Amino acid sequence: MSHIDGDDHMTKDLIDSLESKDNDLSLVTSNTQIPDVEVANLTHDADEINQLFDTATNNVLPESNKKDKPIDTQDLHEDDPKAVPKTTSNGESTSNSNSVSPKLLPNDGKSTPKIQKELRRKSTFVPVTSNSKSLEPSEDDNNNNNNNSRISAYARLDFENFTFFVQTLQVVLGRKSNDETLQQNVDVHLSSKKAISRRHAKIFYNFGTQRFEISILGRNGAFVDNVFVEKGLTIPLTDGNKIQIGDIPFKFVLPSNEPNEENNNQDSSEKQFNPSDAINLRSNLYSKSSSPQSSPKRKPQPSKKVKKEPVSASNTSKDIKPTPPVPTTAISPTASISTSTNAATAATATTPATTTAARKNSINRRNSLLKIRRLSNARRKSLAANDEINELLKDLGVTSIDEINEEDSELLDAQIQSLLDEDNENLGGIEDSLMKLAEFNESAIDDDDDDEEGNENSQADLDRLEKTMEHDAIDDEIKAIDSNLTLLDDEISKLTPLINDTNQGLLEEKETKKKQLEEEKRKKQLQQLQHKNSLAKFPRRSAPLMGKPASIQPPASSSIYSRINGLDKIGKTVSPRPPPPKLIAPVLRVTAEPSAIRSRPPLRAITVSDSSYIATFSYPKTIEEPSKYPKPKVKKEHHKKHSKKVYSLDEIPEPYRSKPNISFQIMITNVLKTEAARNGLIINEITEAIKEVYPYYKYCTDGWQFSINHCIKFTKIYKRLQKRGSEWLYAMDELYINERENIRIKQREIAKAKAKAEALRQEEIRQRQRLEAQKSLPHNIVGRNFASPYANTRVPPNQYNQFSQSSSSSSSSATTTTNGQYGSTTMVGGTSPQAGSIRAQLAAVRGNGNTPATTSTTPSLPAMNDPKTKKSLEYLQKELFTLYKARKLTYDTQTATSLITKAVATTIAQVNSIGAKAGAGDNALVFLVERAPEKVSKILDIALTKSIKEHEGIASKSPSQPATPGMRPEQLTTTSQSAATPTTTPQISNLQSLPVKPPISTPLPQVPQQQVSGVNIPGPIATPNIGVTSGVGNLGTTSIGTPTPTQIQSPATSVIPAMQSPQKPVSTPIPTSVPVPLPVPSAPLARPPSFGKPPGAGSSLSRPKAFGKPPGAGSSLSRPPTFLSNKPSYKRELEDDEEEGEQATNKIAKTE
């Protein structure tokens, strides 16, 4: 590296250069003596330095002195005292600064200083590949002040008032540290600002791409040609690139565009630096003195063999300078020798004249040999041969090859052969040589050779570099041919399907060109093999040659790196073969007696045969003839699942537009039960079969397949058989289906057995209840159809009939019996109930047209056909449904119907009772619905609550002997009242015509006060307990002629005297032996009076009429009503058996 600051560039009078320890600063000047200034007297004073610069400038620029123009002075270093050169007693200038620090002084808006411009113009920036001449020293040079200094460098960094010459393969720019141990990491100190990193950027030469590149290391990045480059990026550099790091701009200059004043009269222009031409730079580094211009005729050398003279050089970071009588004027690298630690300082030393002269002769002789060898190599080059030969001839000082002396050529050839023989003596492994070559490519210039043998080894490395570059050039040419062949193949493959008269000629032309390229490629490959064979095993070198290592990536096509990595140029893997290891087991000495030791075979070393390390390889064999044209590269298309077509409604056939009304499980079962699915089907096959069987799924959108998949995998009636590829085969699991069917059959049998046992248990309960009822009524032989308002009195039915129906007994007693409120509706002969019964009314409410026909016409029949009555019944039904829904009950339909029917019956009975009191007659329901609907709703609510409580078993239980309910007032009226309202009694009696089956004894709500023949009876009258077992059966399907006797409870009459509490009903049996007339009391009686005979009754009440007479045989009742107490036992058992059979059947049906 070279660092020139200010006017110091143009000084020809300075002998020693002011340079830092880590800087390859080289100032090559002529030997003009300056009588006024000496280097040893330099101090830190700025005035002395400026005076020195003025003196040097006056000697160099006489024209400027004539014009008396002031010359700008530049400071060499920054204010850091460590960066200022120190003067020692022996004239050795040292510096603690590791890096060159540009002093960026303000220029007051001016451009680059004139001194810098003059320096860059006068200092010939000579590329390494041209005009690198070694000037031999002569005695006349002491007085020669016209020789201009020359600086050889790879590139140059032009700062605003600072110039940096790049003379190594790698330059690091950044900010130096105050720590002396870290200062060798930075070559160019840009600034002390924190925006610049310690190692901010690195400029290096890339041998792979053969160009300079810059790699950004700082986190703040940099600008290259006003384009920001962030950290971690590496971009190529060309001549003239403007770089800015922080606020420090500079320009990168390459020698290709640098003007050369000395060669303006020559035709050839400067070429860009080629790394293979590093020989000139290396030879200049070894040249310690300038050499004169070579004459057109080269002088013959006195000896045939190169003399090996020791070179007196310092490895302790010092540059050796000749004595003042022999000044040094040479190319810049010869004035600066970099060590591996980059710690070179300027120093002066005196050596004997004889040693210096011998060393110069040896170096010149070696340089001449190298040039001739390069010339012989250049003759074999096919590309750029003329430029290379002209360059070599120029270095040799001749204009053509013919001017070279043949005798000298033979001599030189002999000397070259001796050098080659000397190289052959130091042959090494090719791997070591190649590794050393890589080290050489990645290192900077290093001059640590102290003898001639080291110099010759360095020349062998340079030769190896040259051959490597030629090898890489051939690789690049082969690559270019391959790319051209690829393009031709593509064009031919495109033209082949379009062959016609027009394209035939073009195709033939492409074929011809292709053959030529293939022939050229074979030649290049042959030449490459020759170069590979001639890549000799070069002598080893212990240290790198070129200073700092540069991070240079090897080219991808370089044969050197491929061979280092185990690959040859053909692409085959070359397996490393280490020497086979020898495993030697140590033999221990045995001290026991020989007789106690068994004979053992001698221990032998275990060796491994070499054949085990030979890597096997194989290549495919084919009998097919290679095609003439390359196969077009077929792109691998990934299988993409095409979406299903969406059918419109018009595209779907009419029968397949509606979804089948069956489940997926049934579909899958139908598919798997076919013969085709005997061995199992995969899921996709099942879905396809479903599409065929049910075409609706062929046209519908996707998504139902997931349900099929889930149903198959998680339903136990399907089982997996085996795998077909990666999918399972599914079939019906017959074992599981049979097992589940058996379980179902067993459950059904168990349910039937439980139902039968329950029926038997219910039968036992009913028999027990019947027995208890029979025991509680031993003397009630005659049916109780009349209730006396007094206790302990019984009135025969015929006597009651004479009082209640004296005017109409002859017409109605033959076909019906008026048993009061609780008379039975079933005759012995199976006659139907009256037309005005509650069953007929409920049938009308439900709209049932099959109302049972009546056997006789009664006065209440016209009331059922009245529209007002129907309207009232509809109102009751609607209101009752509203009340039932408001309770949010969860009973089944049969239970709900039973509850509603029971509530309707109770409501109608209560309404008729209230209407009778109010004198409404037959139209009591209609009257109350029209006049007081809120009372009807209240009665409905009470009746529904009662029905629900009875059903749930919450109602209170009555005593074991059922009490006789009290008669309603209309049943206890006098004969005159009965005649005045002839239809009231039948209407009231119809309320009890519904077949019911209540619990044993449960009283209903009582009517508060009732009048019997004008007498106020304060106690509540017990009403019948109406329990409806099935509303539907009782209303519409139960046989009217033969109702079930167990559904009717024997009612009891209960009359409450005035002195008793109205909430407690009193059960009193009706006497049968004292027939007395019914008086009309005027006030409550303390005791019941004795009844006399009723008028027209006869002497006394005898036993009832014969039971066997049919109805209508006599004027009185043919037989009393049949109750549970007086009904024959065999009939009750038969009817109970029929009812239990029906209930058992219903329970079994529910269970199933």
From Swiss-Prot:
Coiled-coil ranges per UniProt: 449-537, 734-777
Family matches, as SUPFAM superfamilies: SMAD/FHA domain, Winged helix' DNA-binding domain
Domain FHA: 171-229
Cellular localisation: Nucleus
One of the GO biological process terms: positive regulation of transcription by RNA polymerase II
Record keywords, A-Z: Coiled coil, DNA-binding, Nucleus, Transcription, Transcription regulation
Stretch list, region Disordered: 55-147, 254-362, 514-557, 787-833, 846-867, 951-1010, 1057-1152
Gene Ontology CC: nucleus
Bias type Low complexity, positions: 87-101, 328-358, 804-826, 851-863, 973-987
Listed Polar residues bias regions: 126-135, 271-286, 1115-1128, 1143-1152
One Pfam family matching this protein: Forkhead
Principal place of residence: nucleus
GO terms assigned for molecular function: bis(5'-nucleosyl)-tetraphosphatase activity; DNA-binding transcription factor activity; sulfate adenylyltransferase (ADP) activity; transcription cis-regulatory region binding
InterPro entries linked: FHA_dom, Fork-head_TF_regulator, Fork_head_dom, SMAD_FHA_dom_sf, WH-like_DNA-bd_sf, WH_DNA-bd_sf
Binding region for DNA: 659-756
Ranges of biased composition (kind: Pro residues): 996-1006, 1072-1082
Subunit structure comment from the entry: Interacts with IFH1 and TBF1.
Task of the protein: In complex with IFH1, acts as a transcriptional regulator of rRNA and ribosomal protein genes. The FHL1-IFH1 complex is targeted to the ribosomal protein genes by the DNA-binding factor TBF1.
Name recorded for this polypeptide: Fork-head transcriptional regulator FHL1
Species of the source: Candida albicans (strain SC5314 / ATCC MYA-2876)
Lineage: Eukaryota, Fungi, Dikarya, Ascomycota, Saccharomycotina
